[in-house]
């Protein structure tokens, strides 16, 4: 599986609701380039991609292989799930799709690595769990999700943490993070 690279240490995750397009415009205007949509349907994803071609868009909460295939075909740049399922990793590998499996234990992280994942989403994204993965599995790139600004600052000091994801942040947080 290809390595997911971002020069942005903060990934913004947004719920798909009536304010989505205006929020995306605000984020793009503020200089953000990587945004993750929470539970986006392929049609919504395609529409957003047409309106915001400069954004690298991902989709979170992928639970089944058909969802992964649909968002990949719709043009998502990456996807993630809240848990570990080998079938999702195997499907992502077929499409060479950037996929972040959720891992809750070192054993799940090791299994993900054995299946070809170079990056995982620690859930829960606690500092202690990410520190453990950083120490014992330093080759895995970590993308913790649903973190606060205070947690983000601490997590980003770990060598293995590539980026953190903040869910529905206030615009002020976005300005501080840049």
What are these regions (language model features)?
Residues 23-24, 65-74, 107-116, 129, ...:
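Catalytic cores of alpha/beta
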Residues 131-133:
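Strongly charged, low-complexity linkers/loops
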Residues 1-75, 93-94, 172-178:
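Conserved N-terminal beta1-alpha1 strand-loop-helix module at the mouth
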Residues 12-16, 33-41, 55-63, 76-84, ...:
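Catalytic beta/alpha-barrel core
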Residues 43-44, 66, 87-88, 107-109, ...:
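Short secondary-structure capping/turn micro-motifs that flank functional sites
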Residues 30-33, 52-55, 73-79, 93-100, ...:
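Glycine-enriched alpha-helix->loop->beta-strand junction motifs that scaffold or abut catalytic
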Residues 78, 82-88, 121-129, 159-178:
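Glycine-rich phosphate-binding active-site loops on the catalytic face of alpha/beta enzymes
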Residues 143-147, 166-169:
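A generic structural motif
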């Amino acid at each position: 599986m290809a390595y997911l690279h971002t020069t942005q240490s903060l990934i913004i995750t947004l719920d798909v609701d009536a304010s989505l397009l205006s929020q995306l415009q605000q984020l793009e205007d503020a200089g953000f380039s990587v945004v993750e949509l929470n539970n986006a349907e392929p049609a919504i994803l395609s529409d957003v991609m047409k309106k915001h071609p400069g954004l690298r868009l991902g989709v979170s909460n992928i639970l089944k292989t058909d969802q992964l295939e649909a968002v990949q075909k719709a043009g998502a740049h990456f996807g993630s799930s809240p848990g570990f399922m080998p079938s999702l990793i195997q499907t992502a590998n077929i499409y060479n799709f950037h996929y972040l499996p959720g891992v809750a234990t070192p054993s799940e992280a090791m299994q993900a690595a054995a299946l070809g994942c170079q990056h995982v989403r620690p859930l829960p994204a606690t500092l202690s769990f990410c520190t453990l993965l950083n120490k014992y599995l330093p080759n895995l790139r970590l993308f913790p999700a649903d973190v606060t600004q205070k947690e983000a600052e601490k997590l980003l000091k770990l060598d293995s943490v590539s980026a953190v994801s903040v869910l529905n942040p206030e615009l002020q947080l976005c300005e501080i993070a840049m």
